[in-house]
Amino acid sequence: ARYFLVELTGGVSMTGCAIVYGCGKMGVISLRGAVFFIYLGILFVIALVDWHIQMIYDRFHIMILILAVLDFMLYPEMGIATRLTGMGIISVPMLVLALAIPGAFGGGDIKLMSVSGLLIGGASMICAMCIGIITGGAYVTLMLVRKRLNKTDQFAFGPFLAFGLATAIFLGDKMAVWYLQFGAV
């Protein structure tokens, strides 16, 4: 089942990146699409590793940082201010919570959101975190109801953050605009 999931995720990721970020010459995915396809692959590995051992290795953060620098060179239209906002808008509050409430968030989760913010920007980061909290909260609620977790147990939040980040690279800006328009009504 895992092999099928990996193959399906890879195919959907490549197709999504080609649709959203376009194809280059001769039908090959654009460079920006390739950056996000690689990012999705890293997120997938992070989700699997964190799920099993509750750890996000720094090598993954470094890879995402490299992708963020490359994307900045390929797509300077998303300015440095937007990227720096993305870097701090979620990770700084997570860090404050982790310092105030020991165990609230792991360092790997905080670093993941920081380097991802450099890549996808502030609006998408807010959407990513909302999706991560909703899906993670639904999972924990289900596990508490089934008595597979108790209130003091820790769980891997990385897979839910990764899902939120993956969703945000396709829909983050659209979701932010929708939310702002919804609030204006």
Regions found by a protein language model. Name each.
Residues 1-185:
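A membrane-topology feature that recognizes alpha-helical transmembrane segments
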